[in-house]
Amino acid sequence: MGYMDLALSYSNQMRIVEAPASGGGLSQNGKFSYGYASSAGKRSSMEDFFETRIDGIDGEIVGLFGVFDGHGGSRAAEYVKRHLFSNLITHPKFISDTKSAIADAYTHTDSELLKSENSHTRDAGSTASTAILVGDRLLVANVGDSRAVICRGGNAFAVSRDHKPDQSDERERIENAGGFVMWAGTWRVGGVLAVSRAFGDRLLKQYVVADPEIQEEKIDDSLEFLILASDGLWDVFSNEEAVAVVKEVEDPEESTKKLVGEAIKRGSADNITCVVVRFLESKSANNNGSSSSEEANQVPTAVRNDSDHKISAKETNQDHTTVNKDLDRNTDSQSLNQKPIAARSADNSNQKPIATTATGHSVSSEQSGLTGEKSQMPIKIRSDSEPKSSAKVPNQTQSTVHNDLDSSTAKKPAATEQSGSTGERNRKPIKVHSDSAARKTTPSIFN
C-alpha cells in the first residue's frame, strides 16, 4: 500500500501540462481579427469548449465567439457549443432584433438540451459567454461565471457579470422560485451548484435558469479588443491584468497563448480557455484606400479550432490564413472541439465585476467574499454597483469550489420548453472553425 501511495505521489508530481491548443483568423471585411487558446491545465479531463466562426447573413459579415465551461461532465458544454450559434443565426429576427434573437436562442437551446438529458442519471450543465459582432455592434450575452472584458480607451471594463447564488437579486429570484442558497465551501444553489445561471442542470432547472444578460457596445475607434475566458483564467487574473497582457501582444492568438500559459504558471487549478477579438476599425480606416474590392471578395481566413486535432507547435506558428479543410468532417465524434485533456476544479473568483460599461450600460454584480480565494485588482467602475449581498459568509477558509452536481441533493423540477418565432435565415456559406455539422445551412429551429 505504501508503494502505491509513493507511486501515485510521484506520478502527480511529474505530470506534464501540455501546451495549449491555439489558432486564429481574420474577418473577410478586415474589421476584426481573433485568436484562441485552450488547455486542460493541471486537470486530467477537459470540460471547457469554445466556438469561433464567421458567417455572411443578409449581406452582413457576422462574427460569433463563445466560451462554454461545463460542470458535471463535458456533455452539456459540448451540446451548447454545437447548437447555440446555429440556433441563433437561423432566428428570423437575428438581424432586425438581435437581442431578442439571442435571448430566444439561449432558452431554446437550453430546452433542447434538457430533452437530450432525459436518459442521463447524472446532472450536467454549462456556462456560456458569447460575443456577437454585427455591423458596428458588439453584443455580449452570458450565463454563469465565464466572463467577458473589453479594453476601451486603454482601460478594462467587464461587459458581463458572474452569476453567483449570493448576489442579492439572484438569491431573491432563487428563493422566490422555492429554492435556497446555502454555504458549502462557497455559496451554492441547493448546497450543490456554485453558479446561479447555466444551461442544463435538469434537477435544479426551476432555480438555475439559462436566461442571458445581454450587453451591447458600439464598435468604434476607442474599442480595442475583447477577452472571453472561462473562470480558470479569472481565478488568477484580474480584468486589468488580463487587459495589460493583451495590450503587449498585437497578435490575438499569441496573446491568448500567453494568458493561458501565465494562468497555469500562477497555479490555476481549472481548465483554461480564452478567446481574444481585436477590432481593426481605426487601422483599416487609416490604410491607403482601406480594403480593395479584391480583398472584399476574399473568403474569411481561419485556422481550425477542432480540439480533437492536436495543434503542433509548427502549426500554431504559421500565418493565420490557413483555410479550414475539415468542413465536412463527421461531427458525431464525442471528442469534438475538446482541448488537451483535463478535469474541472471550480475555484471561483472573488472579483467584483464592473458596474457599468464604457457606453454607460449597467452591468453591476457582486461576488461572494470568501476567505482564501484569489483576490483580484479593483475594476474601473462608472456608476453605482449592485448592492452587496445580504448573505453572511461563515468563518471558514475553504476556497475550492466543486461545480459537479450531486443529483441526490435536489428534487427534479419540471423543465419547460421555450418556443421561438417562425422563419428561416437567408445565409451565405458559413466559415466555421469547428463543428462541421453546424456549418451547413439548416432550417430555422424557430419554425
UniProtKB/Swiss-Prot annotation:
Q: Which domain of life is it from?
A: Eukaryota
Query: What EC numbers are recorded for this enzyme?
Result: 3.1.3.16
> Compositional bias of type Low complexity: which residue ranges?
284-297
Please list the residue ranges that the record marks as compositionally biased, kind Basic and acidic residues.
305-331, 424-438
Coiled coil located at which positions? none
Q: Which cofactor does it need?
A: Mg(2+); Mn(2+)
Q: Which UniProt keywords apply?
A: Hydrolase, Magnesium, Manganese, Metal-binding, Protein phosphatase
Q: Where is this region: Disordered?
A: 284-447
Among Pfam families, the record links this protein to: PP2C
Q: Please list the residues that bind Mn(2+) 2.
A: 69, 231, 270
Q: PANTHER family, alphabetically? A: PROTEIN PHOSPHATASE (PTHR47992)
State the name under which the record lists this protein. Answer: Probable protein phosphatase 2C 71
**Organism field:** Arabidopsis thaliana (Mouse-ear cress)
